[in-house]
Amino acid sequence: MSHFSRCFDECSKIERPNVNKKLTRLIIVLFCLLCIIVTLGVIGYKFLFKMSYVDAIYNTAITTSTLGIAPGDKTDAEKIFTGIYAVLVGVFFISVISAIVSYMFTTYILD
């Protein structure tokens, strides 16, 4: 048996139970944060601007997905809320992407 084969066999036996637990925990936390952000958007549109739930969900989906389609005329307050909400959603998604990439890089590439 060559040196390479023995080394490969030993390396393949290494288990990483903590990696899977950490990744699962990270995904659960990020999913919960996403649910909170979407819920805050729906609540904001529903109660601040007296929209129906369908319109509130629609506006939240448009803002969250960064489509930016502006349905109808909006008041200044709606524009301000949508702008602030869009910035928060953007920061959230950038944070999520950087956290996942950083975690995967340090876990799988540096080890």
UniProtKB/Swiss-Prot annotation:
Location of the protein in the cell: Membrane
Domain of life: Viruses
Membrane topology: Multi-pass membrane protein
Listed Pfam families: Ion_trans_2 (PF07885)
Transcription among keywords: no
A single GO cellular-component term on record: membrane
TM stretches of this protein: 27-47, 80-100
Keywords of this entry: Membrane, Transmembrane, Transmembrane helix
Identification of the protein by name: Uncharacterized protein R694
Organism (species): Acanthamoeba polyphaga mimivirus (APMV)
